[in-house]
Amino acid sequence: MMVENWPAKPEGSQWTDDQWKAVVAHGRDILVAAAAGSGKTAVLVERIIKKIINEENPVDVDRLLVVTFTNAAAQEMKNRIGEALEKVLIEEPSSRHIRKQLSLLNKASISTIHSFCLQVIRSYYYMLDIDPRFRIANQTENELLKEEVLDDILEEEYGMEENQLFFELVDRYTSDRNDDDLQRMILALHTAAGAHPNPEKWLDRLVEAYNVEGKTIEDLMYASYLLEDVKFQLETATEHIRKAMELAMLPDGPAPRMETLQTDLVLLETLSHAARKSWTSVYEAMQHVSWQTLKRIKKSDYNEDIVKQVDSLRNKAKDEVKKLQEELFSRKPESFLRDFQEMHPVLGKLVQLVKEFSNRFQAIKRDKGMVDFTDLEHFCLQILSEQGEDGELRPSPVALQYRNRFAEVLVDEYQDTNFVQESIIKLVTKDSEQEGNLFMVGDVKQSIYRFRLAEPGLFLGKYKRFTQEGLEGGMKIDLAKNFRSRHEVLAGTNFIFKQIMGEEVGEIEYDADAELKLGASYPEGEDVAAELLCIHQSEEEVLDGEEGEEVEKAQLEARLIAQRIKAMVDSGYTVYDRKTNEMRQVQYRDFVILLRSMPWAPQIMEELKLQGIPVYAELATGYFEATEVNIMMNVFRVIDNPVQDIPLAAVLRSPIVGLNDEELAMLRAHAKKGSFYEVMRSFLRGAPLEGGKELHEKLKWFYHLLQGWREFARQQSLSDLIWKVYRETGYYDFVGGLPGGKQRQANLRVLYDRARQYEATSFRGLFRFLRFIERILERGDDMGTARALGEQEDVVRIMTIHKSKGLEFPVVFVAGLGRRFNTQDLMQRFLLHKDFGFGSQFIDPRKRIKYTTLSQLAIKRKMKRELIAEEMRVLYVALTRAKEKLILIGTVKDKEKEMEKWLDTREHTEWLLPDYVRASASCYLDWIAPSLYRHRDSEILLELGQGTIPNEIYEYDTSWKVEFVDGKTLLAPEPAQEEKQELLEALREKKAVPLESERKDEVYNRLTWKYEYEDATLQRAKQSVTEIKRNYQSEDGSDTAFIQKLRAPIRTRPRFMEKKGLTYAERGTAVHAVMQHVDLKQSITIESIQEQIAKMVNKEILTFEQAEEISVERIVAFFESHLGKRVLEAKSVEREVPFTMMLSAKEAYQNWQGKSEETILVQGVIDCMIEEDDGITLIDFKTDTIEGKFPGGFDQAKPILEERYKVQLSLYAKALEKTLQHPVKEKCLYFFDGNHVITIEE
């Protein structure tokens, strides 16, 4: 379908043209490149709504597959779609289609890819050899099972006599002490293979790459890639020489150097020409590299600084060539080929072990009825695909069913998709991109999950292939407008990324389409310029060792951040509040501190707390180190095996038993031999020693408890044991009274929850649980302390950049920008890559030599490029979290050296910094500082001037504060801190402290403070209409409360109640069930109602007993009444209409004393609503006993009943009017007892 047939954007619409295009475009595969803050979720929701309400071709919501990255995102998507549908329903209250969509929403396929896979597997489990009752494996349980399977396989391999290849593998890849490296290789290959649609095929390809028989080095993919890298390095060297020549030609430059530099340039051009031909050509050319010696010059004749720069640039060029010579061309091509020949059979054995491991691991999971997340993807793929003759995957009959079912497949965060997930998506969508039904949204600049095997190349490939028009394939749409941030944040981010992100280094071209464009409007603000603060760490401040240096850097940055936050809060810094559309004073919750990883978080937290700043960080370690958890773990170790001195002594010394050092010594002195446990038993058998009665009592109490716990542990569940220990020791309550008690109790609850999760696995018992925990600790998988903080707490948050993705904060600090990138993965003994497979050193155990191989060199360089690109994207995510103020902080050790490096590109005349500068960066500052040092706002340029920096860069419309901060000034103690220390010392010595203080009034106010919302804490935030009615009228026994939000089918009564008659409530519920389900299209007679009731019994809407209790005559009498006839003749009838609405708390609670603006959530069910020509009538059915209960008959009953139900019907009417946007003309109560009608008047 052509573009012009799409719906036009409505006049006055707030959607941008690109957003509207993303909402309505269809008829082909569509890729939406949505920049940070561009409203992609809103676009996605609007697209779904437009498809659902399309007048010509409406689509049911369960015919859409919406794939999100997280469960939280899926739930938010459902909520947003639900809210949007409810708004449509208000405008079109009679729309059955919209009501149907709301009912279908909960079962719609809006989920993560894993949830969709699970849904497919649950539906078609019989196509797989798995138990339909399978469960998802716990991650730690999964890892432990892997270790068990691997141990078994290796034990068998070691036991085989004729197993030469295995022992050669062991000799090459294990140390003298253990075979941990071999185990890591097998597990890593298993994981890497799992990220491919056909793991075995990928493993086979990996081995085949080492089969070089009949090949030359030119045939190897590794050599082809490395040649491209050789060209890159030679271009870098050439750039250095050209720059040196420019400097040499300056008036004060060393012109005599020109002759040598020109010779150097010819040499580099010769090498570059060889690199364009073949590996062998470069190898031969490298053997003849010879650099001329520089001619001596009289340095006093020339500018000394320029001479140094020229010589430095030449040395850099020589170093580039030298690195190539040493790493790649010090060995003959044939030597590299021999490596592959020798390693080929060994690698074949390694892959055989990986396959064996995968098969056995799969078998043990099948036996235990468990699957992991990788299984979910592969099992789903297995169900949806068949293998064609060419080995390619083709859609199975099941996949074709899904293709027919789904009108469109929408994928959020597409940049984080992996190869297996892409295959699954392809199988359930149309084959042709030009006529496809796949809608993908994402931002490849925010693809930061390569460590989870996400493949940004999938997004990039389509982005390059698709066009804006989508005429010959898929269509791409750029959403570049950012509705989150101020101009200063966006311009600052653009200024940096226009200089550092390119296709060669960074994988993405940061062009005009990729640039962030302003979409949000903010009032004028003060001090909104972005900032770069570089802390200079002087030599005398640096602690010994690399670790000490890191601690010092963390402390310096923490101090600076704390000072800035404190200053901003104290000075009344303002931020914009979108809820009130006004500027307001900044609060602690408006600040976030972003880190690449969390090692610095504890130091930053400590510093902020010292400054009185509330702070929270979700740490990934420290749980098992927490005192309360440690003590409890020792209790359980003693329960499992009391003959363990250290755990038992720890428990005896803990608050649980409460022995002091003297008592422990007295106990040990009782018997010098034997375990503590044996000594304790011996001590208790004897009479209490003189002065040891209290000790005897304490031990007796504990020993009695311990025996009970040991017996309980043998018979009952672990989680019950834990709670029993908490209860009987009172320890849970005890820690609640300590400082940080809320957090400590949360930690103990997590231990209990962890035990329950453990019991849901294939492991059982206290001993195995303790071993389970030990294995977690051995593998370094400690957990963070339990979360004891609400989302809206007024605290500064510290989090990783990864955790911050998708979030936004008014003020963002990005710290640790001077920390080196983590290149540990590149230093491993073996490397794995999706395209290049396996690479490791060549190890000859007989000659005891090892050296790098061509595959290792290629993979290492490729991974370094990918790491650089990923780190750029991580930085982009960090900078785009800020709404109003962005503050970048980094620490450097040698200011002069770093400045020289950063200013090296100051004269560069193009926007994009040289490739070698960007590729050689070792930290974020190596990108940020060279970029900002080309802008007029950098203080350094005030001294140096613009030079040759182009105006469009130098004068770029962005505001920055760039400055160095002296680390010494940060570490100097503050006067206020010294004053606090004096007060603390006085308090410790129990001395009186002066009351005269500027905080005296504040202390008094806090001590006498009364919570202004106290009334709200005494009432429920959610009420049913019936409960509100009871608040107004006391119950007199004749009323039956049976209204619920949704009435469930009536179940069989418990046996002990079967012989008794129905209660008033049960009888009322049965009557309402009949009134809800009776067919109004049939003629209403006693016979027809009896027949319908019988059908309700068959459908299990009613039980036989309940059907017998219903008065059919009363049902018929209603329909013969004037009101009943109106129901039968009405234009439309709705029965059992559930509703939820917000109500003023004053209306809900008669004696409400709280704030007038407080609201509560009210829910209820309206029995019947009829629409007639002149409006809507609301009917509420009542089964109250009236006849014979009121001496004055109905005349006496009427005002009482009217008053009793007036509030209830008023709330029903209010809910209807709010929902339908039409007034309710009449409110009627119908009483089956006596066939009475009461019309409620206001």
Curated annotation (Swiss-Prot):
Reactions catalysed: Couples ATP hydrolysis with the unwinding of duplex DNA by translocating in the 3'-5' direction; ATP + H2O = ADP + phosphate + H(+)
SUPFAM superfamilies on file: P-loop containing nucleoside triphosphate hydrolases, Restriction endonuclease-like
Annotated PROSITE patterns: UVRD_HELICASE_ATP_BIND, UVRD_HELICASE_CTER
One GO cellular component, as annotated: cytosol
UvrD-like helicase C-terminal domain segment(s): 506-806
Key word Nuclease present: yes
Domain (UvrD-like helicase ATP-binding) ranges: 13-486
InterPro entries membership: AddA, DNA_helicase_UvrD-like_C, DNA_helicase_UvrD/REP, P-loop_NTPase, PDDEXK-like_dom_sf, PDDEXK_AddAB-type, Restrct_endonuc-II-like, UvrD-like_ATP-bd
Any one Gene Ontology molecular-function term assigned to this protein's record: 3'-5' exonuclease activity
UniProt keywords, alphabetically: ATP-binding, DNA damage, DNA repair, DNA-binding, Exonuclease, Helicase, Hydrolase, Isomerase, Nuclease, Nucleotide-binding
Keyword hit for DNA repair: yes
EC number: 3.1.-.-, 5.6.2.4
Needed co-factor(s): Mg(2+)
GO terms under biological process: double-strand break repair via homologous recombination
Residue sites binding ATP per the record: A34, A35, A36, G37, S38, G39, K40, T41
Assembly and interaction partners: Heterodimer of AddA and AddB/RexB.
Purpose of the protein: The heterodimer acts as both an ATP-dependent DNA helicase and an ATP-dependent, dual-direction single-stranded exonuclease. Recognizes the chi site generating a DNA molecule suitable for the initiation of homologous recombination. The AddA nuclease domain is required for chi fragment generation; this subunit has the helicase and 3' -> 5' nuclease activities.
Similarity remark: Belongs to the helicase family. AddA subfamily.
Annotated HAMAP family: AddA
Protein name: ATP-dependent helicase/nuclease subunit A
